Amino acid sequence: VNLYSLSSTTKALEGADYALYLVHSMAPSSRLNQGTFEDTDLLLADNFARAAEAQHLKHIVFIGGILPKDSSTFSTHLRSRFETEQTLKSRSTPVTAIRAGIIIGPGGSSFDIIQKLTERLPVMACPEWCKSPSQPIGVRDMLQIIDKSIGEEAYYHSALEVGSPEVLSYMD
């Protein structure tokens, strides 16, 4: 699916009732090389929300990040995740935002990045974000939450914050 194209996205959602939105554009794109990843996130989310509305989807589940109480402390990454959430919610299709800490387990992109770094680098100077607090959640737990959320009207138009009760940094 070409999410840059509204018509392609609309066609891809034809016949669907529910959608799990996992799109995130941290890597630069050759299609939008003048913009930032935040610009790309918003463009793709807007196309997706418009296509979902056009196809009368019943529900979108979006995976974002746990947000600090003070919006002035949002990192660029978390601000982009929140703006993506708001963009998806800007249309008529109900959205459930599941805001999670790092998802731990095989197949999770954050987990895979950290694992590759630790395997390839005997010593690493840790960037500032390594001190950021997080409430990790296991991939199986996350999948159960997603499964229970999809199509559940009680969760429409809501945000759920999920993660471990223990707050850890990436350094921990």
Please identify what each model-predicted range represents.
Residues V1-Q55, I66-T73:
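NAD(P)H-binding glycine-rich loop region in Rossmannoid oxidoreductase-like domains
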Residues V23, V61-G65, R99-G101, G163:
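Active-site beta-alpha turn of Rossmann-fold NAD(P)-dependent dehydrogenases/reductases
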Residues G64, Q86-G107, I113-K116, R120, ...:
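Conserved beta-loop-beta element that borders a ligand/cofactor-binding pocket
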Residues G101-G107, E128-V139, L160-E166:
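Glycine-rich "substrate-gating" loop/helix at the edge of Rossmann-like oxidoreductase active sites
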Residues K148-D172:
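Mid/C-terminal beta-alpha module of Rossmann-like enzyme folds, strongest
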Residues F37-A45, V61, R81, Q135:
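Short alpha-helix in the Rossmann-fold core of NAD(P)-dependent oxidoreductases
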Residues L42-F48, S80-R91:
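Conserved catalytic Lys-bearing alpha helix of Rossmann-like short-chain dehydrogenase/reductases
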